[in-house]
């Protein structure tokens, strides 16, 4: 008893039932089960919650680009630069002039104040951009290597980033920087994942 219809003889498949006693049921069953060549317009995808949307190739391309390590590093660098510039501008604006007010020195002109403000803002911005880029690159590399997205990635990345940045001041500063940055990253991840 074959489930596939005879390709050469259509009349024999209609007249002689293959699966059921009724030829109409047999034709219907063979159309739904046996015909593997038919074009399927509607694909039924089981859904759990809400509607199921199949992504187009363009959406998949954009999603892949946005989730890449290069894009994450670039975004962290740009956003770190912006945050550092804002903090640098704020700290430069509240920084008091350390010159003695009773000394006979000339006061700073507006141009000198703005030049100093610009250099402070740029210095903060560069440092924050560097920290953001290094942290993002290390975290993305660890996440890609481990294949898991959890709080440990941020902790490891924080330890490595803090260690690398603190290493400029010595080994002891590198160890303290790594531990501090790892603890801070863990606290931030815990706060973000617990909400």
From Swiss-Prot:
Keywords: Membrane, Mitochondrion, Mitochondrion inner membrane, Protein transport, Translocation, Transmembrane, Transmembrane helix, Transport
Cellular component terms per the entry's GO annotation: TIM22 mitochondrial import inner membrane insertion complex
InterPro entries: TIM22
Top-rank taxon: Eukaryota
TM ranges: 74-94, 128-144, 164-188
Subunit and partners: Component of the TIM22 complex, whose core is composed of Tim22, associated with the 70 kDa heterohexamer. In most cases, the 70 kDa complex is composed of Tim9 and Tim10.
Role summary: Essential core component of the TIM22 complex, a complex that mediates the import and insertion of multi-pass transmembrane proteins into the mitochondrial inner membrane. In the TIM22 complex, it constitutes the voltage-activated and signal-gated channel. Forms a twin-pore translocase that uses the membrane potential as external driving force in 2 voltage-dependent steps.
Designated name of the protein: Mitochondrial import inner membrane translocase subunit Tim22
Name of encoding gene: Tim22
């Amino acid at each position: 008893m074959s489930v596939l219809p005879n390709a050469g003889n259509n009349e024999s498949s209609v007249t002689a039932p293959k699966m059921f006693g009724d030829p109409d049921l047999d034709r219907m069953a063979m159309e739904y089960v046996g015909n593997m060549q038919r074009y399927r317009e509607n694909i039924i995808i089981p859904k759990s919650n809400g509607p199921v949307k199949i992504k187009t190739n363009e959406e998949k391309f954009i999603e892949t680009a946005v989730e890449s390590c290069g894009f994450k590093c670039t975004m962290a660098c740009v956003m770190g630069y912006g945050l550092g510039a804002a903090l640098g501008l704020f700290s430069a604006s509240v920084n008091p002039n350390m010159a003695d007010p009773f000394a006979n020195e000339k006061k700073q002109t507006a141009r000198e104040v703005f030049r100093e403000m610009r250099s402070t803002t740029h210095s903060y911005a560069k440092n924050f951009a560097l920290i953001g880029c290094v942290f993002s690159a290390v975290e993305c590399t660890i996440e890609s290597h481990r294949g898991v997205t959890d709080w440990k990635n941020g902790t490891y990345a924080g330890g490595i980033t803090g260690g690398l940045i603190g290493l400029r001041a010595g080994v002891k500063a590198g160890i303290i920087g790594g531990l501090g940055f790892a603890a801070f990253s863990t606290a931030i991840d815990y706060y973000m994942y617990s909400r």
